[in-house]
Structure formats: structure tokens, C-alpha cells
């Protein structure tokens, strides 16, 4: 469920040494499955352990995860990174904003997951996003661009060389192409 690097485990052991005996760490997601999802790590004293918590054992400590957060912490990683500017704890949870879907889920759910977890985070660097409108009976994913992508002069390249290639590679035999139905209006909001 959660991978904690050796450096992060050593960091937690050091921090927990100054806490009352029996204190663990808690890894959680606030507003899981939403665009506002935020992950965190906190101390978990013995009296804060809930009966439905999932207990993960590590070297010298345990991590508690509440039942509601658990599916959103699948594939999460915690690391402790040190560089010339100092050190910091990093927590990456690719499924925090959207629950990972199974490989046998309907095509529309699997495409939505890829859009929300992989494509939109890339487009967000330019203030953009895409939305799946429908999948046609011919297997074409109909998309609508928003934000900085709306009216962007690079939208055709993004669509054909980026998004379409990625989706066709991920869903061979299920998708035949992608189509943009956005009424592009170039303006100050447009990236380029």
C-alpha cells in the first residue's frame, strides 16, 4: 500500500524516540477522491488508534491508515530527501485525488482515471485541463479542453502527439482515436 524509503523510516524512528511510548505515525488523506485532496503524516498516540485502522509494520515503528484513506494511498511513497538546501519529507500519493480503477472497469472509467491522474496534472503546468465528453460507438474519445488549453496555438500538437498517442498506447483495441470538440477562443487565458 505505502512504500516508505529507508531514509524516511530512519527519520520516523528518530522523531518517534522523543514521543511517548507506543506512539506510531498516521498517514491520511483529507478530502480523498476530490481535486482538493491533501495527504499528511502525523503522530498517532496509542489512544488515537481506531479499531478499523490498517496497521502497516516498518523498521522500529508502525504506520496507521484509516479505512477511508486506504484506497487513496495505494502506490503512495514517502521519502526523506537531503540536498544542499536542507532536508524534507516527501509524500507522493498518485491516487489521492481519484481512486485507482481496476483493469476490468468500464473503458470510460479507466480513461477518466488516466485523464485525472496523468494527463491533467501535466496540462495544469500551463493552466489547462481536458474533460472526457463521451466515447463514440467507433471507439473515439471525444475531449474538451479547458483553462489555458482553450485557444492555445499548440492544442493540435498536444492532442495528436501527446494525449492521443498516450491513450491509444494504453487502450489498444479499445480506442481508435481522439477528437477535440472545444470551441477554441484565443484570449489572455490561453497558454500560447
Swiss-Prot record:
InterPro entries: Fe/S_biogenesis_protein_NfuA (IPR017726), FeS_biogenesis (IPR000361), FSCA_dom_sf (IPR034904), HesB-like_dom_sf (IPR035903), NIF_FeS_clus_asmbl_NifU_C (IPR001075)
Pfam family, one: NifU
GO BP, one annotated term: protein maturation
Record-level Gene Ontology MF annotations: 4 iron, 4 sulfur cluster binding; iron ion binding
Chain sites annotated for binding [4Fe-4S] cluster: 149, 152
UniProt cross-references to SUPFAM superfamilies, sorted A to Z: Fe-S cluster assembly (FSCA) domain-like (SSF117916), HesB-like domain (SSF89360)
Secretion signal, residue range per the UniProt entry: none
Key words of the record: 4Fe-4S, Iron, Iron-sulfur, Metal-binding
Manner of cofactor binding, per the entry note: Binds 1 [4Fe-4S] cluster per subunit. The cluster is presumably bound at the interface of two monomers.
Top-level taxon of the source organism: Bacteria
Cofactor(s) required, per the database record: [4Fe-4S] cluster
Subunit structure: Homodimer.
Family the entry assigns: Belongs to the NfuA family.
Function (record text): Involved in iron-sulfur cluster biogenesis. Binds a 4Fe-4S cluster, can transfer this cluster to apoproteins, and thereby intervenes in the maturation of Fe/S proteins. Could also act as a scaffold/chaperone for damaged Fe/S proteins.
UniProt protein name: Fe/S biogenesis protein NfuA
Organism listed in the record: Shewanella sp. (strain W3-18-1)
Gene name, Swiss-Prot/TrEMBL: nfuA
Amino acid at each position: 500500500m505505502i512504500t516508505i524509503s529507508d531514509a524516511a523510516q530512519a527519520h520516523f524512528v528518530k522523531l518517534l524516540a522523543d514521543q511517548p511510548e507506543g506512539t506510531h505515525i498516521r498517514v491520511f488523506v483529507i478530502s480523498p477522491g476530490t481535486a482538493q485532496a491533501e495527504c499528511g503524516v502525523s503522530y498517532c498516540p496509542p489512544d488515537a488508534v481506531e479499531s478499523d485502522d490498517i496497521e502497516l509494520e516498518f523498521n522500529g515503528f508502525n504506520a496507521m491508515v484509516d479505512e477511508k484513506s486506504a484506497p487513496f494511498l495505494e502506490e503512495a511513497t514517502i521519502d526523506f530527501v537531503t540536498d544542499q538546501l536542507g532536508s524534507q519529507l516527501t509524500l507522493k500519493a498518485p491516487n489521492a485525488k481519484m481512486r485507482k480503477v481496476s483493469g476490468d472497469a468500464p473503458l470510460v472509467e479507466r480513461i477518466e482515471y488516466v485523464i485525472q491522474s496523468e494527463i491533467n496534472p501535466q496540462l495544469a503546468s500551463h493552466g489547462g485541463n481536458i474533460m472526457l465528453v463521451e466515447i463514440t460507438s467507433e471507439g473515439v474519445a471525444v475531449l474538451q479542453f479547458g483553462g489555458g488549453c482553450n485557444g492555445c496555438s499548440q492544442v493540435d500538437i498536444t492532442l495528436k502527439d501527446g494525449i492521443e498517442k498516450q491513450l491509444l498506447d494504453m487502450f489498444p483495441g479499445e480506442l481508435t482515436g481522439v477528437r477535440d470538440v472545444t470551441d477554441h477562443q484565443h484570449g489572455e487565458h490561453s497558454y500560447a
